């Protein structure tokens, strides 16, 4: 059965996208990005000022059983981690999320309040970062012939590079993946 309002993660996602767009910051928003070794999905990815933001949406109907694991995984890859939730889960999320996680609360009147600013994540994992980037893209930027190395071998070659370079690769990959789609979304939506 389809859920609406604060019981729907999709509805909250739309509200949060509107919230971000209203701020008129130079950013790109991407929907449902598959990341890391475990190939899990993050609800939203935001690219801003050469930084990556993972956004996890928790509606009133969602349970929080996997939240701590999700946060742990996001911290390995993304520069900042944000949780957007409702009043119902506010206290539980404050308890479960460390102080470096940003928290936004969607009120019953559908306004969004920033409860806590995120801090930058410093302990990234090279392999998790590399498994978030498509192997064909790695071939392209590394000038490798596709098929010469399998995906694991290719990622092993890149793992020898410094982590800041790998973070740049991820940002550029995400930018190329989402930029055109986001700009099309903005032009069709009528937001300047």
Give each language-model segment a name:
Residues 1-7, 187-192:
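Interdomain/boundary linker segments immediately adjacent to catalytic/signaling cores
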Residues 111-178, 182:
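A conserved mid-domain beta-alpha-beta active-site/ligand-binding segment of alpha/beta enzyme cores
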């Amino acid at each position: 059965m389809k859920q609406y309002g604060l019981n729907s993660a999709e509805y909250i996602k739309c509200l949060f996208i509107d919230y971000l767009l209203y701020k008129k910051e130079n950013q790109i928003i991407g929907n449902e990005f598959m990341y890391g070794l475990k190939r899990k999905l993050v609800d939203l990815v935001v690219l801003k000022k050469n930084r990556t933001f993972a956004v996890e949406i928790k509606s009133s109907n969602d349970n929080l059983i996997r939240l701590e694991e999700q946060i742990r995984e996001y911290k390995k890859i993304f520069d900042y981690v944000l949780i957007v939730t409702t009043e119902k889960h506010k206290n539980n999320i404050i308890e479960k999320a460390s102080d470096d996680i940003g928290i936004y609360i969607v009120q019953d009147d559908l306004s969004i309040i920033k409860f806590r600013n995120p801090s930058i994540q410093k302990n990234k994992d090279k392999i998790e970062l590399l498994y978030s980037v498509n192997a064909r893209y790695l071939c392209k930027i590394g000038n490798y012939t596709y098929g010469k190395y399998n995906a694991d071998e290719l990622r092993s070659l890149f793992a020898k590079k410094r982590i800041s370079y790998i973070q740049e690769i991820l940002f550029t990959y995400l930018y190329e993946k989402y930029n055109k789609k986001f700009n099309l979304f903005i032009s069709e939506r009528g937001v300047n």
